[in-house]
Amino acid sequence: MSLATKLRRVRKSPPEGWDLIEPTLEQFEAKMREAETEPHEGKRKTEINWPIFRIHHQRSRYVYDMYYKKAEISRELYEFCLTAKFADAALIAKWKKQGYENLCCVKCVNTRDSNFGTACICRVPKSKLDAERVIECVHCGCHGCSG
């Protein structure tokens, strides 16, 4: 879905400062369209969605950084981005909590999706894992977001 379509769906004109973040969000939309149409021959079933998860993470991190770290956008614009689903509100809420600052996706901390009621392997600290083993999250392809 294009950026213009999402804006029409919100039925509200974007707040002041939109022109500052619009070009970057357009680039993320173009990357997302490219990742969605990318051929998936030769990939495992779980690997197909990994580029989409990465772009989604980057886009949410961009909006988060612009509001919380750099303070370059207003609260009104930040909330507009969340309601228009340009950024993932649940993921940003986790980033604000201690220990989840580098979380890759919300699926990795959702214990309902796992067989044993535990978090994803990418949430295990690297110091507690073998150095030779390559760890990849099944959900998003993360190599370890816990530190």
UniProtKB/Swiss-Prot annotation:
Main subcellular localisation: nucleus
Coiled coil: none
InterPro entries (alphabetical): BUD31, BUD31/G10-rel_CS
Residue span of motif Nuclear localization signal: 8-12
One cellular component (GO) term of this entry: spliceosomal complex
PROSITE patterns referenced in this protein's UniProt entry, alphabetically: G10_1, G10_2
GO biological process terms, semicolon-separated: mRNA splicing, via spliceosome
Segments traversing the membrane: none
Keywords, ordered alphabetically: mRNA processing, mRNA splicing, Nucleus, Spliceosome
Subcellular location, record wording: Nucleus
One Pfam entry name: BUD31
Role: Involved in pre-mRNA splicing process.
Similarity annotation: Belongs to the BUD31 (G10) family.
Description of how the protein assembles with itself and partners: Identified in the spliceosome C complex.
Name of the protein this chain belongs to: Protein BUD31 homolog
Gene source species: Caenorhabditis elegans
